[in-house]
């Protein structure tokens, strides 16, 4: 059926900027991928021009970037007056339009829950990225409803990591044995230095990169083997400086970026530097969270962990991170599995 069908692929911005396309051709079906990252106004024109639509996305990962605060984009919960008239806010509440920063995808999911319906929702339970030992924590904390399962792909069936060179020390042994690892960092705040920089964690990340490059040898691929995620661009620069000092050209080509820009990407090994050294920075690090079925869904942490195919390595200050429930549970989980150094 698909082979005999003419399929047109384009971005939402391209399609909406060329409305004449819909005058030339009528589409029976529109499939919108990554729809949880698209705001409702950007989709309405497209969806009204087709007979049927399918939205694909994950509202438990990062949503669209909105400049307004959550309060400013929110819908009042009581009736409001405007130009002498009365707006009945209950109408919007009934269709789960509670905040304009939410995607249509997320609103429809909540609307179905609110109406206790499920016939319009399909869950893709199979995932072909994370090894089961990495997927266990996101499943336990974020995907209790969905209960993701491996496809399985070949790397998801591997029982051991392919690090065969002799170990240099205990950390190498840990890297060989565990897929979820946490390395504690130390306080290293300096006067007149940005809070968005952590020299100790940058050094840890650089050392980990050296070790991974050594283990992979000729198999190392800068675009596939390893990636580094940090919350601040200042930290990216510090890690880059450390890599330059190693004198390993292949490592200078790896991707080091924020969680927001890493969404949609994957690497065999992901190194996540929490970076923060102040309790107040936890609000930024875990700011994109919500509660579902009594459980906290931390979208940023979810994205970070689910980028990894074979190994997830994290470094952060335990004394700071313990002040956040999810981060505390993450460290406890890694300890329970033996991956806490």
Language model regions located:
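Inter-Walker segment of RecA-like/P-loop motor cores
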Residues: 1-14
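Conserved helicase motor core of SF1/SF2 NTP-dependent helicases
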Residues: 13-15, 20-32, 36-341
